[in-house]
C-alpha cells in the first residue's frame, strides 16, 4: 500500500555486510527469534528501486478549502473537439454559491486558528474532494495541443466556509460507524484472543454531515494533561521520514500494508534524545527497529508502516505498528509528546481502516501497550510504557482516551478543538455523489517518457476532472507518455500506445512506474546476441509485450536500426533470424572491430575527430587526482594544477572524439582556469543566481564560503557569537538539488547551504499552565561512575544484564554466561556494585552486571612485543580474548600444539600474562604459560615441504623460476605484480626461502619470499592534516555520534572524531585495519576454503567455484560477495534462491527447469518472488552457479564500485570529508571491520589488499 505524505526516497547505502533472513528480535523489546518461514519470498529489495517505493511522492502544499464538489463526467466518453474550439484549451465555467457555517465556538474554549486535525498520511485513488460550487469543462484526451493550459478560479467569487485546510485524498479506509466515544474497557481478565484482520479494507465514503453542529467529545477519564492539550489546541508536527534502506522488509501476517493495530512503547532511557535513539537503532537494527519515534517536538517515522518491524517480540511483530515515546522532562514537553503520539496513532488507525479498541484489559483490540503484548500474547516480557507515564502523573487510559478523541475528530464525528460545529469531516475522502470540480490550477506540459501501469491502480481517466477512473486491463505494459497534467495537488500522465500513438487515457502519477526517455535515433550497427534472448514490441517492454525469442544455436547476429535511451539504459530495435523487436543493450555484444585512433600532436587539431562546443551553466570541483589543465582541448597532456578540491564555475562544454571537457573559471571573477576532462571533476548543474531579501537564523560556528557548494579551501569565515545569529540573505543559487544563499552575519559575508539556516519563529504568547500540580519525581543522587581497567568472566548462573543500573529488573543474561568481557566502568547503586561490560574489542558497551555474578581480575596495559614462540603440546588453545573461556576459543589446543606463534603484544590478567599474535593464519590470545621461546637455529637447506598460503606479489621487477635458485630459467614478474600467488610448497636453500605455487594465469612457478608479501598495503596522501579533516567532521550540522553508555548517543567531541579517523592507529590494529580492505579486489581464496565455509548454507553449499569465478570476472572481494548472498538468501534457504519458474505469469516451484536469484535482483516489493524469478529467467539463470556469476556483475557495479571501496572511505570519505558518508557513528567502520575480519577467520584466510589514506 503506497502512501503519499512527505515521502522521500531513502539514500541507498552501498554496503551490505551482515545479517541473514532469520534475525534476532530486539534485545530490549523482544527476546525470541522470529520465524520468517512464511515470508521467505518477501525480500528486502534495497539494491533496486522497488515499485512500491516509486509510488511514493510528496504531497503538494495544502490548497484552500472551498465548499462543493466536482461535476461528474463519464470517463468512457471522449468528447471530440468542436469546430469553434480553436485553441484546444481546457475551458472552465464558474458558478459560485455562498455556503454558510455555524461559527459558534466550543463552550469554555476560545476559538483557535485552525479547526482541523490534519491527516498525516494519504494515498490517491479518487479525485480530491473540494468544497466549492464550480463547474468545469473536463480536460479531454483530445484537448492536449496546448501545453500551457491553465484554469483559474476567481478568488473574489469564492466565499470560504472554513479556514484553509489540507486537501488530501485517501483510500483503503474503513466506513465509519455512528458517532461513538469509546471508553477504555473494564479491567477484567479474559481468555486471550487474537484480533483478526479483514481480508480487504472497504473504501470509506464520508459526505459532509447534514448536521449543523457536531457534538463535543466527552472524555471518559479525568486528565489534566489532556485538558491542557485540548484547551491550548496543541497541533501535531508534520511527520518526518528517516527511512534506512538496509532495514529488512517483511509483510505482516495478513500481507503488506495490513497491520492490525499499534503498540505504545517508551524508550526506557531518561537521558537520550530522539536523534540519539534513532542513531542507536540504525546501528543495531539486527537486534531491533521500530516504525517511529515521538517526542515533544517531532514525529519521525523510521520504517514504512506497510511492513512489520522488530520491536515487540515474535508474536506481536507480524501484527502491529511499533512506536516509541522518547522521554521528556517538563510538563509542557510531556503534554506535547502525548498529543503527538495520540495524533500519530489516530492517523495510523484511520489510514489502515482500523477503529480504536483498547487491548489493555482483554488482549483484544487495536491499541496495545508493550505490557499488554507481554501479558496476552507473549514473546516478550516488557511492561512499558506504564512506569514512564506514571512518572508524569499520567496513565495509559488517559492516552487511549486522547487517541480515541483524535480519531473521532479526524473522522468528522465530534467537533474539533476550538469549535462547536463543522459541515465537513476533517479527513478529505471520496465523495458519495458527484458535484463540482477541483478548484486547483490546471497546468499541462509536453512529456517524452514511458510508463508502466501498476496492477493496483485508480483506473484510466478520460479527463483529469473525472471523479473516478475506468478500470483497465492494460497493466504492467510499457506505454509512451505524451503529456503531464497537474490539477491542484494531483499529477497525471497521458499514456498512449508506443507504436501507434493511440491514446488510452490519463493515469495518476502514483499508479505508474515512470521513466524519462530520450527520442529514438536511427543507427546501423550489428551485434551478437545469445539464443533464447527475448525481443519486445517496445523498449523497456514487459512479459506481456514479448515479440519473440532469438532462435538458433550459438551467438546470432542482431542488426540494429534504431536506439532509444530509457532512464539510464539503452534499448535497440533490430532484426535477428527474421524476427524484429527491442532488446536491452546489456544483452548485446558489439561485433564491430575497434579502429585505432591516431594520437593527436600537442596543440594541433586532429582531423579525424569532430569538435562540438556548447554553453553550460554549472559548477565543478577538480579531483585531487587529475590529468591537469588543458589550454586547448587538442592538447596532448594537461599542465599540473594546485586548484584541486575547489568549486569553480563551468561556462563551456566541449566534446572531441571520445573525450569530454569542461571550461572552468573562477566563480567570482572572469578569470579562466582552463579545460579539464570530465572524469577529473565532480560536476553539478547550477541555476543562475537570483536576488532575494530574506532573514534567517544560523548557529554560531557555521562555516561561510566564498562560493556556493564551497570546500574547506574556500572558507570565508565562521559565524561568531553565542546562540542563534541573524543571517541576512541577498542572493540565492540552486546547485543540483541543494539551495545556497549568500548573505551577511555579524559583519562577515559568504555562502551557506540553506540546510544550515532556519526561518525565525514567530513570537508565541505564553500559555498558562493548568493549576493541577504535578508530583515531583526525585531520584537519589547516584555515586560517581568510576573508570576502571578490568576483565571479567560471567558466571553460568547470573541475575542478568541491565541497560542502566537504575533498572529494577534485569534482562536474561544467559547468552553472556561463561564468557570473558572487558570491564570499563564501575558504579555503586544502593548496596550493590555494578560494572559495565564491553565486547571483546573494548569499545562497544554491552550492559551492566552485578559484580556478584562475575569473576573479576585486574587488566594491565597492553605492551607491544615482537617474539616467536613454540606452543606447548599441552595448551588451552587460541582465544578471542585474554583469559577467554572454552566458548571463545578460535583454535583448540590440538590445532596449535607445537606450532609457531608470532606475538605482537601482551597484557597481564591478574598474575598471568597473555600474548596476542598469529598462528595458522589466525590471530588471538594465548596464555604465556602455554608458550616456549625457541632457541635460535641456523638456517640450512631443507627439503620442500607442504605449505598452503596465498601471498601477494609485491616486486614487479622480480622473477619467477622453473626451479628454485636457477639463473637461467627465470621470467619477469611484471605482468603479475600485485596479483595473488597461491603457495603449496616451501623450501629453504642457502638461507633463502622459496615458495612454489600457482600464478594468476594458472602457471606453476617458484618465487623468492622477498618478492612476496602476506598483504599489499597502499598509502594514499590526502593533502590534508588529521586535524583539518577531523575539524570538518566535527563541524557538520549532523554531528558524529558516540555511545559512551548503552543506548545513549551523544555528539562526539573533536578528540573522539580525531581518534576514530587516525589511520596510523587503526592500521596497527589487526582487526580494525580491515576497514581499509579493498572490497573491489578479489584475492583468489581457494575454492575448498569457500566450500568449507558454505557448508550447511542451503543452495549456496558447494558453490565455491561459482563465487571464485564471479569474483575474478567482476573484480569483487569474495568475502564481501559471499556475505551479500548470505544476507539476501537467508543463508541460502529462500525460495528465490532455491528456484522456481514463471509460467503464464504465475510462480511454479515444482517445475523441471528452475531459475535462481541469489542477490534479490529485481525482486520488487509488490511481488518479489515472481519479479525476481522473472528476472532470473530472462537472464537465463537456470542454475545456482549462473545466478551467482550473473548477479555478481550487478552487485559490483551497484555497490562496491560506486567509488568508496573501503569501509573507511564509506564512513569518512577522505577525498571529500563531510560529504556522502554512510553513518554518523564514529565507530561504524570499526564495527563492520571486525565483522569482515570474523568472516575471514571463519574461512581461514586473511585480507590481502588494503588502501590506507595518510594525513599530513
Curated annotation (Swiss-Prot):
The protein's name in its UniProt record: Bifunctional autolysin
Bias-annotated ranges (Low complexity): 172-196, 421-439
Domain notes: The GW domains are responsible for directing the proteins to the septal region.
Source species: Staphylococcus aureus (strain NCTC 8325 / PS 47)
Positions of region (Disordered): 103-151, 172-214, 419-440
CDD domains reported in the protein's UniProt record: PGRP (cd06583)
Gene name tied to this protein: atl
Skewed-composition ranges (Polar residues): 103-138
Stated role: Endohydrolysis of the di-N-acetylchitobiosyl unit in high-mannose glycopeptides and glycoproteins containing the -[(Man)5(GlcNAc)2]-Asn structure. One N-acetyl-D-glucosamine residue remains attached to the protein; the rest of the oligosaccharide is released intact. Cleaves the peptidoglycan connecting the daughter cells at the end of the cell division cycle, resulting in the separation of the two newly divided cells. Acts as an autolysin in penicillin-induced lysis.
Endo-beta-N-acetylglucosaminidase: annotated segments: 776-1256
